[in-house]
Curated annotation (Swiss-Prot):
Residues 1086-1122 are annotated as: Disordered. Residues 19-494 are extracellular. Residues 557-826 form the Protein kinase domain. Residues 516-1137 are cytoplasmic. Keywords: cGMP biosynthesis, Chemotaxis, Coiled coil, Glycoprotein, GTP-binding, Lyase, Membrane, Nucleotide-binding, Receptor, Signal, Transmembrane, Transmembrane helix. This is Receptor-type guanylate cyclase gcy-1. InterPro entries: A/G_cyclase, A/G_cyclase_CS, ANF_lig-bd_rcpt, Cyclic_nucleotide_synthase, Kinase-like_dom_sf, Nucleotide_cyclase, Peripla_BP_I, Prot_kinase_dom. Residues 840-871 form a coiled coil. The chain crosses the membrane at residues 495-515. Residues 1088-1098 have a biased composition (Polar residues). It is a single-pass type I membrane protein. Belongs to the adenylyl cyclase class-4/guanylyl cyclase family. Its EC number is 4.6.1.2. The lineage of its organism: Eukaryota, Metazoa, Ecdysozoa, Nematoda, Chromadorea.
Length: 1137
């Protein structure tokens, strides 16, 4: 009633208290004195909040602040009033602090009710209040009601939610609440808040079976309470204010036999001491907090209860604010000097309590008083001013309270509502009786539900080490009085047990019989399975009619006829490079290979059983193994097209990109399947073990045979497919990794892409051993096959993938699964099946074959005509026909022919004035037009050598005596043409000919097989050559025989004259003649010049060329000398200048 009267007066007449308040604004000065008003208590709860054992914390805190660099610009003055938590005294002291002493800050009374009153008073005068002691009531955290109050003690409501979380963590929901009586009613308030949190609908339901108050010196009441607790609960939450009461509780629960494995005593505290007490008697301390264990006596000696209290402490846990102090040495210093500090200046406490205080004990809340003063000093320093208008402004100052620091009560964090954000921890004792934190309950952002962190992994060993490593139950199995134990299983189910035993025995007998049957069946099944993979040697028949396909014709894709399944229907199959043998088994052709006889283990046999079950389109099916002969013989399905090595070695087939892609994809799919099976890898992959069936589908063979030794020593060439890490380590298949298969796959892919053997070994300068050595050697740039393909549309990504697969480091190679995944995007989605692709190719080939044949036939006919024309230009037609027919051309004699020789006069001089190209072009122009003139006459051009020109008439087609006329006419045309012929690069030079003609017998024939030539033999030819060499420029020189033929058979047609007798080399003296032209075509002056010549009469007969003659088939053109020599040039190759 007293407090309400005081508050009413304070609210009605506030002017009484503030009317004489002077202006606080003063001139700034160098150092400012801070006045601290302290409402202390000496006679209540002396060991906890007594000023004699706590007051020294204030000057020690100021001293520590200055050591840490704070409050250097301030001095402090203390005004202490012992209010003893009396409400009237609190109001009086508050008014004196504010009105009389004009304090800057008030350290409030250490009791919750008194602190509320002081806070109301200070709020009206804008003074900050620091709370400590028993001030954990929840309403004191209301920043709206108490905006200027701050404390380092968390409120008990937070403790309640932490306790609720703890019970949930250990699955307890039935508890007892016990608390010691005190005048300040601290524990009573705490338990009220605990009860409120347990009843909060947002928390798990907790059944409070008893809530009782116990007394330190009232053993009768306490005994009754403990007896009631024993009959109702095993999980006890209890609260006390002093260390004496803590030790008293331990001794009492030990006396009442409440320290068994069923009991859990959890002390609720917010004093940051856990299992410790604040004393300086020199007794052992905890390593974490630096405090003395509560089971130690409070005297320098012992009182005989230490062992009992220590044993009881093993059944106790403490839920307290984190008590770990960072600076334990200063805490020890504080414990030793706190009494001295309160007695010495500036406190100068001279009361009886201060002067007689026990120097070995520090007050329970002394550390909290230290921390709250330390907090004020930090906030004061952070105002960065000694101006009272600044630090005296409480609204500015309270914002600086929101901070954190390492204090004597652990890590202090002040929230925006000016209360401490606690870290509650559940403490227990380890095997060394040292307190350890077991569970952490952390509050963040003012949320009332803490976060739980467990500091242990094994709950039984860490938390319940003193409980037999088993968590106690909140309700004992036998009840609280031990009378509700369940009936033993034997007594309750004795009859049922006998019946069950009989049934079990009967079932065991049935099971034994069943097991025997199962074992027998499994043995029979195992024998049957073994019989499946064991192929009797007697059933393997070598086919006498087996025919290799070496002599058989093969199509472009190496197709071969199918193999009949009967004994009588044996046909050809492809060759095998490996030592395979084709045999008959169960009326089917199979592929076999021999191995040396070895001992087969149980694991080998089980593997063969599993191998028979392997089924994949790219795996060659394993039929079995013959083990009843001198050798082991493996039997697999026959692939009629042989192996990839066989196909590539023959090399007489075409393969486009999609065909290559499908072959490589089949190998990759086979590997992917094997790598996922029990075999794990192939281990012997090479192109010889990749077999191809009729459908051009690749199937991997020789897998799972690594424990068998081949009958013949394998060639070193097989090492070309082996990965470098296998070569270096000489690894067996069981030691290899699947990446070794990937390397072998890359070598096979390179064979397919290049359509050559591995490493192109046939065209490579290194032999197998050198290649294997270099691969084994490795290095920064290891040797690898070259991928050079003649297929233009090969996807570069496929080549890149192959190169990735033969990477030197096994880990860098892709897996078979990755290879298959990447290959899906390397070909058009419309193309998926190789046989469909082959059929499409055949259809396209069939549709275009007829057109191609017709076109080729036309081309062949045209080329044949061209060849015939060319051949007819080289040889006479009839001679060429006989040569084309494969007939021998016999030499043939002719009685009368005329031979023509010509030569360019002074050709050497002309050639010296020309470059070689110009010389060739000169002769080409001249002789091309000569050839045109020849075509108009019955003359055959034999050859032209340099500037020499040889022609003949009268062979190979006989023309009577017309040959002399043809030669003379042609010679006159030659002379006429030379008069109009101009040399482009020598316009002043003229071309003149010397012509020699002779008639007589001759022999002609084809000489030679390489570049055959139609040659003339006989003296007639030599004499004609002498006529040319002894002739004169621009004149036609005839022998007497030729002249006689001309004048006899063609009289009066040609104007000739005798040259007289001339000495001819090899002939002696000969009379020769000149031909000047034809009558009627010569100028009159020319006729007068030769009128005195004697000329035989001639006739007007003319020779008509035979259209069936050899030269008659050549293309001809009409020669007109008036048109110039350009008209007669042929379309022949002309060498450029």
């Amino acid at each position: 009633m007293q407090i309400f009267t005081i508050l009413l007066l304070f609210n009605i007449f506030p002017s009484i208290f503030v009317q004489n308040l002077p202006d606080t604004t003063v001139a700034p000065r160098t150092k400012r004195t801070i006045k601290i008003g302290i409402a202390a208590a000496q006679r209540i709860q002396t060991s906890s909040i007594g000023w004699s054992v706590c007051g020294g914390a204030v000057p020690l805190a100021i001293e520590r602040l200055k050591e840490m660099g704070f409050v250097k610009d301030f001095d402090f003055e203390y005004i202490v009033d012992y209010t003893e938590c009396d409400l009237g005294s609190v109001v009086r002291a508050g008014m004196e602090f504010i009105k009389t002493h004009k304090v800057d800050v008030i350290i409030g009374p250490p009791c919750a009710q008194a602190l509320r009153l002081m806070s109301f008073l200070a709020e009206n005068y804008k003074k900050p209040v620091l709370g400590w002691g028993f001030v954990s009531d929840t309403d004191l955290s209301d920043v709206i009601r108490f905006p200027h109050l701050t404390t380092v003690i968390p409120n008990s409501l937070m403790l309640g939610y932490a306790a609720s979380k703890m019970l949930t963590t250990f699955h307890w929901n039935r508890v007892a609440l016990l608390y010691y009586f005190s005048d300040v009613k601290y524990c009573s308030g705490v338990m009220n808040d605990i009860e409120a949190t347990f009843n909060d609908p947002s928390t798990p339901n907790v059944n409070i079976v008893i809530k009782a108050e116990i007394y330190l010196n009232d053993n009768e009441t306490t005994d009754n309470v403990f007896q009631t607790v024993k009959s109702r609960a095993r999980i006890i939450l209890w609260c006390t204010q002093t260390s004496v009461e803590k030790r008293d509780y331990l001794i009492k629960i030990a006396t009442h036999d409440m320290i068994g494995d069923e009991y859990v005593h959890i002390m609720l505290s917010m004093r940051n001491v856990a299992f410790g007490t604040q004393t300086s008697l020199g007794k052992p301390t905890f390593s974490q907090s630096g405090l003395t264990p509560i089971w130690e006596s409070f005297t320098e000696g012992t009182d005989g209860f230490e062992k009992m209290a220590k044993q009881a402490a093993t059944r106790m846990f403490v839920l307290d604010v984190n008590s770990e102090v960072a600076d334990k040495k200063y805490l020890e210093y504080m414990q030793k000097n706190i009494i001295k500090a309160v007695q010495s200046p500036p406190m100068n406490c001279s009361t009886v309590e201060c002067m007689t205080a026990n120097t070995t004990i520090m007050g329970g809340y002394a550390r909290h008083l230290f921390d709250v003063v330390y907090l004020y000093g930090i906030a004061l320093t952070h105002t960065n001013s000694t101006d009272p208008a600044v630090y005296g402004d409480v609204d500015v100052l309270v914002h600086q309270f929101v901070t954190s620091f390492q204090g004597m009560t652990g890590h202090v964090v002040i929230s925006p509502n000016l209360t401490r954000m606690p870290i509650f921890q559940l403490y227990g004792l380890n095997s060394d009786y040292d307190q350890v934190a077991l569970v952490d309950f952390t509050y963040t952002n003012s949320v009332m539900v803490p976060n739980v962190t467990l500091f242990y992994k094994d709950e039984g060993g860490a938390v319940w080490s003193y409980y037999g490593h088993s968590r106690p139950l909140d309700i004992p199995i036998c009840g609280f009085l031990g009378k509700s134990c369940p009936v033993s299983f034997w007594e309750q189910y004795k009859i049922l047990i006998f019946v069950a035993i009989a049934v079990i025995v009967l079932m065991v007998l049935i099971m034994i019989i069943g097991c025997l049957c199962v074992i027998s069946g499994k043995r029979a099944e195992r024998a049957r399975i073994n019989a499946e993979w064991q192929v009797p040697f007697a059933k393997l028949i070598e086919s006498e009619k087996q025919v290799r396909g070496k002599g058989a014709s093969r199509r472009s894709l190496q197709s071969a006829p199918s193999i009949s399944t009967g004994h009588s229907g044996v046909t050809t199959v492809s060759d095998f490079c490996e030592n395979y043998t084709m045999m008959m088994y169960e009326k089917e052709m199979v592929l076999t290979a021999k191995y040396q006889y070895t001992h087969l283990t149980k694991a080998d046999k089980e593997r063969f059983v599993k191998m028979r079950k392997l089924d994949h389109e790219n795996i060659n099916r394993f039929i079995g193994l013959s083990i009843d002969s001198a050798h082991f013989i493996s039997v697999t399905k026959l692939c009629s097209r042989g192996s990839l090595q066989d196909i590539l070695s023959r090399g007489n087939f075409s393969m486009d990109y999609f065909f290559m892609f499908c072959i490589i994809r089949d190998v990759a799919k086979g590997l992917e399947y094997l790598h996922k099976t029990f075999l794990r890898l192939h281990g012997n992959l090479r192109s010889a073990t990749c077999l191809v069936n009729d459908s051009w589908q690749v199937k991997l063979a020789e897998y799972g045979m690594d424990n068998l030794v081949e009958e013949q020593t394998p060639p070193k060439k097989r090492l070309l497919w082996v990965a470098p890490e296998v070569l270096r380590g000489s690894l067996s298949v069981s030691q290899m990794e699947p990446s070794a298969d990937i390397y072998s796959f890359a070598i096979i892919a390179s064979e397919i892409l290049t359509k050559k053997e591995a490493w192109d070994i046939l065209d490579r300068k290194e032999d197998c051993e050198e290649i294997v050595y270099n691969v084994k050697k490795g290095g920064l740039f290891p040797i690898r096959p070259e991928i050079i393909t003649d297929i233009h549309d090969v996807n570069p990504a496929l080549i890149a993938l192959v190169k990735d697969c033969w990477a030197e480091v096994p880990e860098d190679r892709p897996t078979a699964e990755n290879i298959c995944s990447q290959m899906k995007g390397l070909v058009s989605k419309q193309k998926t099946n190789l046989m469909d692709h082959v059929f499409n190719m055949l259809e396209e080939y069939t549709s275009t074959l007829e057109e191609e044949i017709e076109e080729r036939t036309k081309e062949l006919t045209l080329e044949k005509k061209k060849a015939d024309i060319l051949l007819s230009r080289m040889l006479p037609k009839q001679v060429a026909e006989r040569l084309k027919a494969g007939q021998t051309v016999e030499p043939e004699g002719f009685d009368s022919v005329t031979v023509f020789f010509s030569d360019v006069v002074k050709f050497t001089i002309l050639a010296s004035k020309c470059s070689p190209f110009q010389t060739v072009n000169l002769l080409n122009d001249l002789y091309s037009n000569f050839d045109t003139i020849i075509e108009q006459h019955g003359v055959y051009k034999v050859e032209s050598i340099g500037d020499g020109y040889l022609c003949v008439s009268g062979l190979p087609t006989r023309n009577g005596y017309a040959h002399i006329k043809q030669i003379v006419d042609m010679s006159l045309k030659f002379m006429e043409y030379c008069k109009s012929f101009n040399i482009p690069h020598l316009p002043r030079e003229n071309v003149e000919l010397r012509i020699g003609v002779n008639s007589g017998p001759c022999v002609a024939g084809v000489v030679g097989l390489s570049m055959p030539r139609y040659c003339l033999f006989g003296d007639t030819v030599n004499t004609a050559s002498r006529m040319e060499s002894n002739g004169k420029p621009s004149l036609i020189h005839l022998t007497n025989d030729a002249h006689s033929l001309l004048t006899t058979h063609y009289p009066n047609q040609y104007e000739t004259s005798s040259r007289g007798e001339v000495i001819i080399k090899g002939k002696g003296v000969m009379e020769t003649f000149w031909v000047h032209g034809r009558f009627g075509e010569m100028e009159p002056t020319e006729l007068r010049s030769i009128s005195n010549r004697s000329t035989p009469p001639v006739t007007n007969d003319r020779w008509i060329p035979n259209p069936s003659s050899s030269h008659g088939s050549r293309p001809s053109s009409v020669y007109d000398p008036l048109q110039g020599h350009q008209k007669f040039k042929m379309d022949t190759l002309k060498v450029a200048n």
